UniProtKB/Swiss-Prot annotation:
The modification N6-succinyllysine is found at residues 68, 75, 122, 130. Mn(2+) binds at residues 50, 98, 183, 187. The gene is SOD2. SUPFAM superfamilies: Fe,Mn superoxide dismutase (SOD), C-terminal domain, Fe,Mn superoxide dismutase (SOD), N-terminal domain. It catalyses: 2 superoxide + 2 H(+) = H2O2 + O2. Destroys superoxide anion radicals which are normally produced within the cells and which are toxic to biological systems. This is Superoxide dismutase [Mn], mitochondrial.
Length: 222
């Protein structure tokens, strides 16, 4: 099972992807709200398919791939280990990303963050509105499928915006610790917003769980 810790998320798969001798299988996390709770901004059909089909597929495929990887390790088959890396990255990243995404959303979300997170956003982006514009632009600008992210650069102590293709996990790709992720795969919005990704990006700000994002930020500052 993927840990629900809020800091260093991508490192939580390290035991499973490295030493597999006593690994536990990953499982699909429960949503902290009903499928229809984010309406009208994200409808119930999208949420049901996104969680119970798409995320579940990443979990199942990750478990299968890890079993194959364990067999390759036991056999000392380096070629097979290398060949399995893309599937580990894709399905492991999909599991990490979606496990963060669900907690980043809330039917009681929207508005602005408070306290230290808001001050950090103002410091690093000028204002909350400028931050929204930059993260929206980065997310809309993803070519094909991927994610827009607000991450924390622990070395610099600053917030940064980044975009990752496909299911590449933010921390494993950039070193940034994920705080807020926006899924811009078509399965996240197409049934409701068709091919108009900007409309989906406009709507999702109404359900951002700033309490969760703040918890992640405060944990990573320690």
């Amino acid at each position: 099972m993927l840990s629900r810790g809020v800091c260093g998320t991508s490192r939580q798969l390290a035991p499973a992807l490295g030493y597999l001798g006593s690994r536990q299988k990953h499982s699909l996390p429960d949503l902290p709200y009903d499928y229809g709770a984010l309406e009208p901004h994200i409808n119930a059909q999208i949420m049901q398919l996104h969680h119970s089909k798409h995320h579940a597929a990443y979990v199942n495929n990750l478990n299968v791939t890890e079993e194959k990887y364990q067999e390759a390790l036991a056999k000392g088959d380096v070629t097979a280990q290398i060949a399995l890396q893309p599937a580990l990255k894709f399905n492991g990243g999909g599991h990490i990303n979606h496990s963060i995404f669900w907690t980043n959303l809330s039917p009681n979300g929207g508005g602005e963050p408070k306290g230290e997170l808001l001050e950090a956003i103002k410091r690093d982006f000028g204002s909350f509105d400028k931050f929204k514009e930059k993260l929206t632009a980065a997310s809309v600008g993803v070519q094909g499928s991927g994610w827009g992210w607000l991450g924390f650069n622990k070395e610099r102590g600053h917030l940064q915006i980044a975009a990752c293709p496909n299911q590449d996990p933010l921390q494993g790709t950039t070193g940034l610790i994920p705080l807020l992720g926006i899924d811009v795969w078509e399965h996240a919005y197409y049934l409701q917003y068709k091919n108009v990704r900007p409309d989906y990006l406009k709507a999702i700000w109404n359900v951002i769980n700033w309490e969760n994002v703040t918890e992640r930020y405060m944990a990573c500052k320690k």
